[in-house]
Amino acid sequence: MKNVKCLLVAGLILFVGNTSAESRRQKVGIFGTEVQFTPFGHDDDYSLNSLKFRYFMTDKDALRLKIGFGVESLKYEDDEFGGNLEKGRLGDLSVDLGYERHFKVAKRLSLYAGVQVGVYKHFASAKVEYTEDLGNGSHTYQVVYKNCVPTSEGNVGERAHVGVAASVFTGLDFYVYKGLYLGTEVGIYVMSTKTNQTELKYSDKVIKGTDTYRAVICNAIKPMVRLGWTF
């Protein structure tokens, strides 16, 4: 039995050795697609947050298209919010176009670095039911928040905005077998954003916000886990 186990291990080693030379598939004309996960995302949730497509112009140079997305449902504790939150959503959508330069580290391992630019949209909306005590009774009404969500006091809180961004990044690709690979990526980005006009609607009244503002944000890209395939 022990000899059989030794033969199996030896065979596995020979198999990996024979396939490792063809495991790294980064050649001119190769197309790749991958999903990207953020293990340390919002509230430490492990969530899928983007798709990436890659095309190798040469054995070392690749163009990339990245589409990012995410949706979060709002929740309030009963003692923190003055109304009944019927519906609340925060969302994000981004489209980035970039360039990667690849460096062979080993037969199965590739290091790359690059730059990208893109556009970004942050969504925010909510629908809340409030009950007002009038002394001799109560009055219930609904408020629709557009391009914003309420604070725990019912005021305008987080707002929707649009932006443009540029980033630099570096990452690793480890080819498990032929075109299948695992990887990670980190980087930094600079983004210029502008808030959208807010709107509160209740009964027959509409209150539109008059203030919009711009902001410049510089931050690190959270480490991500990537699973991809080249063909």
Regions found by a protein language model. Name each.
Residues 38-42, 84-88, 155-160, 210-214:
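Outer-membrane beta-barrel domain signature
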